[in-house]
A protein has these predicted regions:
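Cytosolic, long alpha-helical scaffolding segments
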Residues: 1-226
């Protein structure tokens, strides 16, 4: 019997694995947006619609995992962090899937195609947001290893490095957003005002997925200091 089994037998089923599964599902939702964004940029609306449907299904599955974890999470458990901490991370993770679904829905309903001046920049931003989410997933997946090693100094350094990577990628996404907004600002006068408003909204929502991924890492970091 390994150490993880011993922990489970002593303190009940660990909530860590369900949290990791939820983050994996959330990340798959954002990854699918990359497919959607490419299709929309090419005005391949049939392919975009398929990706949009897939995003919706993935978000629903993430929601099911979230509700299952919340319902089965004991009020107290023998972990070096609180139930509230775990629920906070869960809700932040879930916001990534929610924002992704809303963003794809907005772009699909309006058949949104960005001006050529920054269309590729938007795709680059989506890639950065996906990378940020992936880095947060890697960090969360290290949580059970931390517990098994009793928060050893070596393992903490590994996790700290992972969280630093999340922060760096999120900063890159901020820079990318600013670049797109600056380009859009220069084009505003030549574009329909309603389109401009929704372009800004789409850029903001996409950036919020990276912000949420960074918050997952930050919250994780706070949990480790308690």
């Amino acid at each position: 019997m390994n150490s993880k089994d011993n922990i489970t037998n002593l303190f009940g089923k660990s909530p860590i694995n369900p949290l990791q599964k939820h983050m994996k599902q959330v990340h798959s939702c954002l990854k699918e947006f990359g497919v959607f964004a490419k299709a929309a940029n090419s005005e391949d609306w049939e392919k975009a619609q398929l990706a949009h449907i897939s995003i919706g299904k993935k978000e629903q599955k993430a929601d099911v995992l979230k509700k299952k974890l919340r319902m089965n999470l004991p009020s107290t458990f023998m972990m070096p962090f609180s139930r509230r901490d775990l629920l906070d991370v869960l809700l932040i993770q879930d916001s990534i899937a929610n924002i992704t679904k809303d963003l794809a829905g907005l772009m699909m309903s309006r058949k949104m195609v960005f001006p050529k001046d920054f269309a590729d920049d938007f795709l680059d931003l989506s890639k950065l947001c996906i990378k940020t989410s992936a880095a947060a997933l890697v960090a969360i997946n290290e949580l059970d290893e931390l517990l098994e090693t009793a928060f050893s100094s070596r393992e903490r350094k590994i996790v700290d490095k992972m969280i630093k990577k999340v922060n760096e990628l999120e900063h890159e996404s901020d820079v990318a957003q600013e670049l797109i907004r600056n380009k859009l600002y220069l084009l505003e006068a030549s574009l329909p005002p309603i389109d401009v408003m929704f372009y800004y909204r789409a850029i903001e929502w996409l950036g919020e997925t990276a912000d949420a991924a960074q918050k997952v890492g930050s919250r994780f970091e706070v949990m480790l200091t308690k």
